[in-house]
Amino acid sequence: MIVNDYLAKTYGPQPCWELVADVYQTERFAVPVDYKTVNRSIREMSSAFRLAIHKSAHGFVQIDAPVNFAIVLLGKSERVGIHHCGIYFDGRVLHALPGITVYEELSVIRDTFELVEFWAKA
């Protein structure tokens, strides 16, 4: 994966989920998500992706240690829950925020988010 290709991009209203879909579409395989692009909220988008990943219809399993191309699900706290995501690659997490895509060390991610889950294709 050429990380700089993704760092040069900006994504729409729900940038993190759109980045994950873009990376999987480009680098791996599409992750079909039953979600319409009209009136999407962060919670609805998160729900759709979590269902696509957690139901394992696409062969995803939760793993303890990250591997390249693992989807990283993130949450600020248990109360808030999972609401952000990225892609693990070479010790860092590629994730998108409104207006910018960043590639941060996993240690920085762990300092920022209380909840960190890794999901990989089985």
Q: Which residues does each PLM region occupy?
A:
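Solvent-exposed amphipathic alpha-helical surface segments
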Residues: 27-30, 56
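A glycine-biased structural micro-motif
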Residues: 3-11
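Surface-exposed patches in mature extracellular/periplasmic domains of secreted proteins
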Residues: 13, 31-36
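Active-site nucleophilic cysteine motif
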Residues: 10-27
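Short, Lys/Arg-rich amphipathic alpha-helical interaction segments
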Residues: 103-122
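...with weaker cross-activation on analogous glycine-rich loops/strands in unrelated enzymes
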Residues: 36-102, 121-122
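Residue-level signal for pocket-adjacent positions within structured domains
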Residues: 6, 101-104
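Short, low-complexity, intrinsically disordered N-terminal peptides in bacterial proteins
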Residues: 1-2, 122
